[in-house]
Amino acid sequence: MRLLISCILILSILVNFISGHAVLVAPTPFSTNPSKTKLCGGGTKQTVAQITWCPNSSKTNRATWKIVVGDGAGAVTFKLATNGGTTEGDFTTTLTSKVLSGSDPKEVGTYYMDVRVPTGTTCTGTNGICTLQAYTESSGWYSCSAIKLDSSACDKAAEETALVEYNVQVKDNVKFCDQVVNKVVLLPAGTQLGEYDQRTQGVFKNNMANPLVIGQNSSQCGNLYEKVLCDVSFPLAPGSDGKPIYQVTQKQCEDFIEVCDVVSHVELYPCSIYGDGNGSNLIIIPTLLIISILSLILMF
């Protein structure tokens, strides 16, 4: 499970190659880039709810917080602006939250949190939305997301909003990262495969054009970077031994660093993780078995 989370963590580093180091992942925030900009981490304010939560203090809602680099550590506080605002005075409701791992985020990794909304809370903002704020008081990272509150969400288990497997079988769904077609991948619940694939392609194009990210943007570099980026953007479900299944080898990752001249940022690309997993070309795991394994993972 740690290796799986590490794989997903790399996605954040590659997609958000900036100085920020902690960010809300789910519900989808105004900005997917980690930021210390008060009070919502920058980005564009959403006018449509990203998710519907349960307004009942006896029920839990799932949020996902990610620390990309160590300076993003610290307890995460959740507040709610029921009027949909984003100013200091709007965030009047502090929500109760608990990290599933049992301790506050202290190191690089992905953290799932159960968040409770006081019973009877209603959203009065435009389109019936509230603004959810998540921030670390000790290290000062901020994120916000537009959400709705409705009792219909109270019947859904919080676990459903953690990780969900997708059986990618239709090629039209994933065109850029077509290496995952007909594969079972793990992505946050609610992810639209086509949109996610397009966003990954956009990240690829932007980074290839940015010399601060990719030092040598040759065609050989592009081929290597595409494989690495798609592998971490669409992590495959783990094998029967619990280890992640990678579609990139450690050698390919190291070649990417060298050919693309990203040696100065080598700490952001832990190629050693590829030596701990299984190559997808060597192991074929039945879909039913993968889903069973995933179900066990989500229990812990």
UniProtKB/Swiss-Prot annotation:
Residue pairs linked by disulfide bridges in the UniProt entry: none
TM annotation in the entry: 280-300
Positions bearing carbohydrate: 56, 217, 278
Keyword terms: Glycoprotein, Membrane, Signal, Transmembrane, Transmembrane helix
GO cellular component: membrane; phagocytic vesicle
Signal peptide positions on this chain: 1-20
Compartment annotation: Membrane
Gene3D superfamilies linked: Frizzled cysteine-rich domain
Domain of life where this protein originates: Eukaryota
Extracellular side: 21-279
Membrane protein topology class: Single-pass type I membrane protein
Protein name: Uncharacterized transmembrane protein DDB_G0281067
